[in-house]
C-alpha cells in the first residue's frame, strides 16, 4: 500500500557509483531541491520529509528559506538524520552563488569555518535532528567526536535525539529464516549450535563447541567502535 516516487536525472546520476565525483555538491544540491520541486506534480503533500546525511542536507535549508510559505508547501516538517558526522559535505563558499541559489538571508545558515557545510545547514533548519542511537547523539556533542560541529549541535541540542535502528522481526525470525542453516525457536534453541558449527565450517574455522563465535557487522572505520573491540580482544582471546 506504499507508493514510491523515484527521482532520476541521467546527467547527474547515470554513473557507476553513488558519490565520489568532482560535481557531488552540484548533484546533491540538484536532488535536494528537486525533491521539493516535484511535490506539486505528484499530487501528494508530505507531513514530514526525512533527510539522511549530507547528501540530502540541503532540503531542510531550501524548504525553510524558499518554500515554507508557498501554496501547497505549508506546515511540512523536516527531520535530518546523521548517520556519520565525519562526512559533512564541505565545499568552498563560491558554491553559494555558482550552484546553490539560496537567498542571501540564508547564507549564514550554511557557512561554517570559511566554507559551505551542507550538514550544518540541515542542523540549523530541520525541525528535528536524529542520529542512529542515543549514545551517538550524546557523543557528537563532544568536540572529540563531532568533527567541528559540536558548537552548533550543543546550541541545537533541544531538537537532537538518537533512535536505534529496528529490524524486521518477520524477516529475521529464526523459526522461518531461509538464510540460516537450521531453524530454531526460543523454546528450542539447542539447534542454534548447528548453525554455529555450519558457520565455522563455511569460514574454514575449527568446529569447536567450546570456542565462542563472535560476529560484528560493520565497516572497518573508527566510528563503528572497532577501538572498543580492540580494547577487549586480548581478554577474549585469553579466555
Region spans (language model):
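Catalytic cores of nucleotide-sugar-dependent glycosyltransferases that transfer UDP/GDP/TDP-activated
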Residues: 1-239
Amino acid at each position: 500500500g506504499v507508493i514510491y516516487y523515484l527521482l532520476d536525472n541521467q546527467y547527474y546520476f547515470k554513473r557507476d557509483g553513488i558519490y565520489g565525483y568532482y560535481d557531488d555538491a552540484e548533484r546533491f544540491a540538484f536532488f535536494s531541491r528537486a525533491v521539493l520541486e516535484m511535490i506539486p506534480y505528484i499530487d501528494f503533500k508530505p507531513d514530514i520529509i526525512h533527510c539522511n546525511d549530507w547528501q540530502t542536507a540541503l532540503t531542510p535549508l531550501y524548504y525553510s528559506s524558499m518554500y515554507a510559505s508557498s501554496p501547497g508547501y505549508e506546515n511540512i516538517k523536516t527531520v535530518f538524520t546523521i548517520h556519520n558526522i565525519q562526512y559533512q559535505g564541505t565545499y568552498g563558499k563560491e558554491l553559494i552563488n555558482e550552484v546553490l541559489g539560496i537567498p542571501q538571508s540564508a547564507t549564514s545558515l550554511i557557512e561554517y569555518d570559511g566554507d559551505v557545510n551542507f550538514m550544518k545547514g540541515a542542523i540549523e533548519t530541520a525541525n528535528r535532528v536524529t542520529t542512529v542511537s542515543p549514545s551517538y547523539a550524546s557523543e557528537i556533542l563532544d568536540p572529540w567526536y563531532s568533527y567541528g560541529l559540536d558548537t552548533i549541535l550543543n546550541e541545537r541540542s533541544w531538537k537532537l535525539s538518537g533512535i536505534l535502528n529496528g529490524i524486521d522481526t518477520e524477516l529475521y525470525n529464526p523459526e522461518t529464516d531461509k538464510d540460516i542453516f537450521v531453524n530454531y525457536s526460543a523454546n528450542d534453541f539447542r539447534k542454534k549450535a548447528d548453525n554455529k558449527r555450519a558457520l565455522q565450517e563455511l569460514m574454514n574455522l575449527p568446529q569447536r563447541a567450546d570456542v565462542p563465535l563472535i560476529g560484528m557487522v560493520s565497516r572497518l572505520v573508527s566510528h563503528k567502535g572497532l577501538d572498543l573491540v580492540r580494547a577487549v580482544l586480548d581478554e577474549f582471546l585469553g579466555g
